[in-house]
Amino acid sequence: MSIFKRAKRTVLIPPPHLLSGDEERVTILSAEGEIKVTGRRPTTLEEKIYYSMNLAAAIVGGDLHPSFKSMTYLFQKEMEFGSTQEKVNFGSRKPAPQTTYQVMKAREIYLQTQPLEKKIPMQTYSVSTEGATITFTGRFLFSSSHVGCDDNRTKLAGLDGFTTSNSYQRVKDYYAQETALALTFAAPEKRGKEK
């Protein structure tokens, strides 16, 4: 496990096999971007949580990942209280409503003089669920206390760089993480009278 303590090495979102059961210590320090829901808009709290869980699982590779809970909460909170824009996408064959939520969370944490966008490239993640496609475009900054670092300095979160390195491939092969996670969450039941 010394590969996670190298100096001048970016520790990114850890793969699912690095679970240590310390979900409470995982913190999203900063996040910015937008969530686009194309199709059925989530209206109830249950639907917003359902959409958030699917999107978070698609980003971190499963619901067992240490940062799954905090990411789900962040997305659900933005869908519930964040600013919203709704428009119709006329560029498709079947025009579907497109709802956009602005994700913005920040604390007074300064790594260096460089702003967040210079450190972490924009990533796009997309997942399809019942009647909708959810896409997040943005960047995250996580605390490093859950990835085996010596100190609590923040590390960059993303899915490039580390996942393409030889060290990651060796660890991935050793832990046999080639199997894809097939995640299914129960869709919330519709309430009301059927016509």
UniProtKB/Swiss-Prot annotation:
| Pfam families recorded | Rhabdo_matrix
A cellular component term from Gene Ontology for this protein is: virion component
UniProt keywords, alphabetically: Host cytoplasm, Viral matrix protein, Virion
Q: Which InterPro entries match?
A: Rhabdo_matrix
* Major location (coarse): virion
Where in the cell is the protein located? Answer: Virion; Host cytoplasm
Q: Which residues cross the membrane?
A: none
Its Gene Ontology molecular function terms?
Answer: structural constituent of virion
What superkingdom does the record give?
Answer: Viruses
Q: What does this protein do?
A: The M protein has a crucial role in virus assembly and interacts with the RNP complex as well as with the viral membrane.
Q: How does it assemble?
A: Homomultimer.
Tell me the protein family, please.
Answer: Belongs to the novirhabdovirus matrix protein family.
Question: Any idea what this protein is called?
Answer: Matrix protein
Chain's gene name: M
